[in-house]
Amino acid sequence: EGTNKQAEYTRFGLNYETFWKNVDRFLTELPKITVNIMATFNALSVFTYGELIDKVFEMKKKHQNNQRYWVSAIQLDTAYLRWPSHLSVQILDDEHKQLILKSAEKALYYGIKTYKHDNYGFSNVEIQKIKRIYDYAVGVSVLFDVKKNRKDFIKFVDEYDQRRGTNFVETFPQLKEFYVRNKKG
């Protein structure tokens, strides 16, 4: 759901570099296999998802061949998190939600018109799954209590940091102002 330290924060125990070395090795040694990365887009995905799209595209390009049953070497299957609601993209400020749209635009840029073995890039399905996250983010229901969920988010990251020995604000400096404002309020 992200890259580098932010991915390692959300997937505690993950070594980001080792993960990608293993994906690369897997695709190299098994040229008929397709890797499907299932990503649950959440409030912490916003800042590095575009970088993840770059990385997946790099692997698509490097490992494209005509031996695979599924055309692409690697697919990014993006879903959005609904529960727990305090980790949903709906808690974010509008400026952060715009980053979701930028990720969808990047996937569209890397998209392919024809899904054939001699092409590489993001399929229309991969692109649409990222686009719908933006629609979900801006389409906040009147039943969604943004203020309560933001408070619960702060409680969650504070408890997470205490238990794991991590530091949310250092890992996600883009959310420092959001964190401070919602911790007070």
Model-found features: residue ranges?
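Radical SAM enzyme [4Fe-4S]-AdoMet core and its adjacent flexible, acidic
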Residues: 1-185
